[in-house]
Amino acid sequence: MSEDRTGHQGISGPATRAIHAGYRPDPATGAVNVPIYASSTFAQDGVGGLRGGFEYARTGNPTRAALEASLAAVEEGAFARAFSSGMAATDCALRAMLRPGDHVVIPDDAYGGTFRLIDKVFTRWDVQYTPVRLADLDAVGAAITPRTRLIWVETPTNPLLSIADITAIAELGTDRSAKVLVDNTFASPALQQPLRLGADVVLHSTTKYIGGHSDVVGGALVTNDEELDEEFAFLQNGAGAVPGPFDAYLTMRGLKTLVLRMQRHSENACAVAEFLADHPSVSSVLYPGLPSHPGHEIAARQMRGFGGMVSVRMRAGRRAAQDLCAKTRVFILAESLGGVESLIEHPSAMTHASTAGSQLEVPDDLVRLSVGIEDIADLLGDLEQALG
């Protein structure tokens, strides 16, 4: 979807955009929610006479189009494309923006799935990469080569919660003729809008906070660059990694409450981080909302809240990390994040196992918490009993 055709261009508030952008009440029925258009093909008024531009569901579907308009609106972008997963969106972005012989700069604590795709798949096609600590702008600049076409940013990163200065990296990318993509999954558009800070592309696993209920898998790319969007659209259609209409509906349903949920996620996560910071079993707490976090000032400047993700390192090492994961009752031991329920995991053995033995290897004493929107007393009580 390349524009908001719904008459909501004048809406400025993020919560209002999340609720209203992308769809207006149906003129025939008055339905206030977008219908689930469960059709694989669309009738034509004569050869080539498309109704609303729809011909085949892989190419376009009205429910998906409404979601794409909503996603563009909440990121304050001109164009958005929805995908069947965050990794499908990642794959599309890399194929659209890189060619054999090109080079990409990535975080030295990137998401394991992103690292695996670049390291195990794109290197087969002679795409080179350099992991670097994105908080160190001098290191980022030194990593850029004449073949660098893309700087891949996560902020906060998964799972070490590092913070990168989006504006500074975007300026560096402009100076060195490299595009800047920001994976905004951890912050969500409710807390951070990278396009406004100078990024060229924003990526989401909409499975996480945007969907928000652990019941749908999806991804998205948002940009103001029409040429890039055309390439994304070509690959979206050509490769076919698109969400079905029910997936698009569920994602759009979740998006409506995103701003409200992120407020509660952030409040709860801050309380959890402060509690864990004072616990003797914990050696360090990684949460950008803590003043002790090295990226706190940058996060406070470019985010409207610090999010719902907290990572901790256990003083007694790997066994203590695994024990904590095993003993919680409210926090559910599971991969993924961003749902209303609280989750706990051991990244080195779960989501980031693919980084083992690499520069991106995750410490085995690390526990990642996706702090949900439950009552904070129950969350703190659960962690207290699990820590003993």
From Swiss-Prot:
PANTHER family attached to this UniProt entry: CYSTATHIONINE GAMMA-LYASE, TRANS-SULFURATION ENZYME FAMILY MEMBER
Region (Disordered): 1-24
UniProt keyword Transferase, yes or no: yes
InterPro entries: Cys/Met-Metab_PyrdxlP-dep_enz, Cys_met_metab_PP, PyrdxlP-dep_Trfase, PyrdxlP-dep_Trfase_major, PyrdxlP-dep_Trfase_small
Major site of localization recorded for this protein: cytoplasm
A Pfam family hit: Cys_Met_Meta_PP
Compartmental location: Cytoplasm
Catalytically driven reaction(s): O-succinyl-L-homoserine + L-cysteine = L,L-cystathionine + succinate + H(+)
GO molecular function annotation: cystathionine gamma-lyase activity; cystathionine gamma-synthase activity; pyridoxal phosphate binding
Enzyme Commission code: 2.5.1.48
Broad enzyme group: transferase
UniProt name for this protein: Cystathionine gamma-synthase
Record note on cofactor: Binds 1 pyridoxal phosphate per subunit.
UniProt-listed PROSITE patterns: CYS_MET_METAB_PP
Example of a GO biological process term: cysteine biosynthetic process via cystathionine
Keyword annotations from UniProtKB, A to Z: Amino-acid biosynthesis, Cytoplasm, Methionine biosynthesis, Pyridoxal phosphate, Transferase
Modification N6-(pyridoxal phosphate)lysine occurs at: 208
Function: Catalyzes the formation of L-cystathionine from O-succinyl-L-homoserine (OSHS) and L-cysteine, via a gamma-replacement reaction. In the absence of thiol, catalyzes gamma-elimination to form 2-oxobutanoate, succinate and ammonia.
Encoding gene, per UniProt annotation: metB
